From Swiss-Prot:
Disulfide bond listed as a keyword: yes
Lipid moiety-binding region (GPI-anchor amidated glycine): G115
Tissue expression notes: Highly expressed in brain (cerebral cortex, amygdala, hippocampus and subthalamic nucleus) and in acute human leukemic cell line MOLT-3. Also found in lower levels in testis, pancreas, small intestine and colon.
Name listed for the protein in its UniProt record: Lymphocyte antigen 6H
Subcellular location: Cell membrane
Primary site of residence: membrane
Entry keyword Nucleotide-binding: no
SMART domains, alphabetized: LU (SM00134)
Name of the encoding gene: LY6H
Signal peptide span: 1-25
Lineage start: Eukaryota, Metazoa, Chordata, Craniata, Vertebrata
Membrane topology reported for the UniProt record: Lipid-anchor; GPI-anchor
Organism for this UniProt entry: Homo sapiens
Subunit details: Interacts with CHRNA4 and CHRNA7.
Length: 140
């Protein structure tokens, strides 16, 4: 067992280390007008930024479903919406030429690429892969 003075010194050192660690701001994926989210890169946000945003702009009339993706740090989701739903773009949105989807989140890199498939086949495949070794071990 450590003497009381050593325990006290250890606790004081731990408190100093915890309190002196630099505060790290939010990290978000960052890219502009890309068609592929894998082209986005992590970026440390400014202290005033509180959300990560993803903006997807699509052309609903296109048979190819053309789209562009913008990912960024922002001070608020309302700020992003005001920017992308500006008077200039509203004409295109209201006429059906463009569709704009804005999603915001508050955790590091939460605006990254979507998770692996949400299809029933992806779920079934994952379940089979995880149960496979147990089924083989159980044997006939």
């Amino acid at each position: 067992m450590l003497p009381a003075a050593m325990k006290g010194l250890g606790l004081a050192l731990l408190a100093v280390l915890l309190c002196s660690a630099p505060a790290h701001g939010l990290w978000c994926q960052d890219c502009t007008l890309t068609t592929n989210s894998s082209h986005c890169t992590p970026k440390q946000c400014q202290p005033s930024d509180t959300v990560c945003a993803s903006v997807r702009i699509t052309d609903p009339s296109s048979s190819r479903k053309d789209h562009s993706v913008n990912k960024m740090c922002a001070s608020s989701c309302d700020f992003v919406k005001r920017h992308f739903f500006s008077d200039y773009l509203m004409g295109f949105i209201n006429s059906g030429i463009l569709k704009v989807d804005v999603d915001c989140c508050e955790k590091d890199l939460c605006n990254g690429a979507a998770g692996a498939g949400h299809s029933p086949w992806a779920l079934a495949g994952g379940l089979l892969l995880s149960l496979g070794p147990a089924l083989l071990w159980a044997g006939p």
